[in-house]
Amino acid sequence: MENLRRHIEEITSITDDEFELIKPFFTIRKVLKNQYLIQQGEEAKYEFLIIRGIFRVFYLDENGKEHIVQFATKNWWMSDYIAYFNQKQANMNVLCMEAGEVLCLTLEGREKLAMTFPKMEHFFRVKLTNGYLSLQQRIISLLSSNPQQRYEEFANNYPNLIQKVPKKYIAEYLGVSRETLSRLYSGS
């Protein structure tokens, strides 16, 4: 749980007493490689804070084609947010790509934390704002950048993922073929 405290204190300071009251809202879960945290059609009960591991958030279209929305690693938050915030069935899958550990937070727990602790409301607001910014940047990149620019941006922003995530998934995330990614990778 010390990872959680450090993560919170990157944004706001909390006392030992406050942290003792915050901890029970989170549960720790160990996750095996290729284990799902969320699958399409299931309820998305939790938002997850990654303690360790690499995860892939994706959906499968009606033809079975995978569309990767996000990779997530240490200190990143992830879920199927449409399902989580609306308490509906998931459209996304969250799959562990490397054995890991996450902290799980229910929507009810999140709301109670935000109402009880103004510092946590501030923390969640900052995290949500950062998520919006990242999402908008990803959309702009997909709409206006060429494959080379998207690859360079990904490599600069996520150098640890370039080495750990299989190339086929990076290609899917960038919206390019595996062959195009190979050319980009060898040219950098």
Give, region by region, the residue ranges found by the protein language model:
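Short, Lys/Arg-enriched N-terminal segment that forms or immediately precedes the first helix
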Residues: L4-R6, G131-I140
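Short beta-strand segments in beta-sandwich/barrel cores
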Residues: T27, Y36, I54-Y59, E101-V102
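Glycine- and acidic-residue-biased ligand/ion/polar-headgroup-sensing regions
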Residues: N34, K45-R56, K74-N75
